[in-house]
Amino acid sequence: MRLYIGSLLICVLLGIVPFATANTNRSGYEEHRNYLLNIFHNPLVNDSIKEKNIPELIAFYQRYPTDIPLSDADRQQFERFIHDYREYREVLVDGVPPQGGSFGNIFGHFLGRVGTRYISSLFNKKREEGQSNHANSPTTSPSRIQKMTK
C-alpha cells in the first residue's frame, strides 16, 4: 500500500512540475520579447544602446529558436551574424575584449537586413497574438474611435 501511495504521489508531482514551469517560461518569454522590442523596434533608441543589447537578442534567439518564424535564408543569415559578432568579441586588445564603441560593418549589416526581419517577425507575432486576444475579449472601443466610425 505504501508503494502504491508513494508511486501515486510521484506521478502527481511529475505532472504538476512541468505544468508550473511552462507558465513560468511563457511569462519569461513575454518579458524578454517585450524588452527586446522596446529596444530594437523603437526608433528613439540610439545604435549604441542597441549594440549593448545584442547579447540579449542573441540569448533570446538561442533560447527560443523556433518561436519566431524566419525563412531558412534569414535563419542562416542570423546564425552568420551571431558567428561574426562572437568572433569580433573574441578579439583581444591588450588581453581584454573590445570595450564598447561601434563595430560598424557587422552591426550595420545586422540592422540593415537580418535584424530588421527578425525584429519585424517578433513584432508581428506580438501583434497577431494581441489581435487574437482582443478578438476574444468583449471590450468596447475608446470613445474617440467610436466617434470616428459613426
Swiss-Prot record:
One of the GO biological process terms: response to oxidative stress
Pfam families assigned to the protein according to its UniProt record, in alphabetical order: Turandot
Superkingdom of the source species: Eukaryota
Polar residues bias: start-end ranges: 132-150
Chain positions covered by the region annotation Disordered: 127-150
Signal peptide extent: 1-22
Keywords: Immunity, Innate immunity, Secreted, Signal
Entry GO terms, CC: extracellular space
Location in the cell: Secreted
General function of this protein: A humoral factor that may play a role in stress tolerance.
Family: Belongs to the Turandot family.
Name recorded for this polypeptide: Protein Turandot X1/X2
Protein species of origin: Drosophila sechellia
Phylogenetic classification of the source organism: Eukaryota, Metazoa, Ecdysozoa, Arthropoda, Hexapoda
